[in-house]
From Swiss-Prot:
PTM: O-glycosylated. Hyperphosphorylated on serine residues, when in dimeric form. Phosphorylation by host CK1 is required for the hyperphosphorylation of NSP5 dimer.
GO MF annotation: an example: RNA binding
Organism: Rotavirus A (strain RVA/Pig/United States/OSU/1977/G5P9[7]) (RV-A)
Record-given protein name: Non-structural protein 5
Acidic residues bias (residue ranges): 152-165
Length: 197
């Protein structure tokens, strides 16, 4: 797991770091040592406005910014420095001290005596419990169990039409009574199903 923190979104932390003047550092450019006093601008918006208004237009350089965007202005202000005009180095004169190999000719050394230590602990706990309850479906509840029809065969005459049989064999069938009772019961079941629907 990696944790990345954008310092530009934490003005309260950075304000205590860049409020004071940092120690002077020594930069090396093309073999020349340059002493420079760097002063970080306060991230407070009001202080920055006073700083910009106190400077004359010709003294405002690329390192100064008048951006009103909080994130952009703070990001620029945290890196903005005031330098002396005499501390500049001409690139034309720097070519004279370049080594013949042209390897490692431009070197910049920068040291910052202040830093940020961030310690973050992330604890997470996820518990999932599921209960599976078996419930009878509506079909099972609505299903009705009808009694079983039992009938004995007999030889009694029952009134049956010839249309009930293809060849008129029902008149001589010994299961006429059973067939008739079954047919009446099937009609009752059909009517009951229609009412339920």
């Amino acid at each position: 797991m990696s944790l990345s923190i954008d310092v530009t979104s934490l003005p309260s932390i950075s304000s205590s770091i860049f409020k004071n003047e940092s120690s002077s550092t020594t930069s090396t450019l093309s073999g020349k040592s340059i002493g420079r006093s760097e002063q970080y601008i306060s991230p407070d918006a009001e202080a920055f406005n006073k700083y910009m208004l106190s400077k004359s237009p010709e003294d405002i350089g690329p390192s100064d910014s008048a951006s009103n965007d909080p994130l952009t202005s703070f990001s620029i202000r945290s890196n903005a420095v005031k330098t002396n005009a005499d501390a500049g180095v001409s690139m034309d004169s720097s070519t004279q001290s370049r080594p013949s190999s042209n390897v490692g000719c431009d070197q910049v050394d920068f040291s910052l005596t202040k830093g940020i230590n961030v310690s973050a602990n992330l604890d997470s706990c996820v518990s999932i419990s599921t209960d599976n309850k078996k419930e009878k479906s509506k079909k099972d509840k609505s299903r009705k169990h009808y009694p079983r029809i039992e009938a004995d065969s007999d030889s009694e005459d029952y009134v049956l039409d010839d249309s009930d049989s293809d060849d008129g064999k029902c008149k001589n069938c010994k299961y006429k009574k059973r067939c008739f009772a079954l047919r009446v019961r099937m009609k009752q079941v059909a009517m009951q199903l229609i009412e339920d629907l």
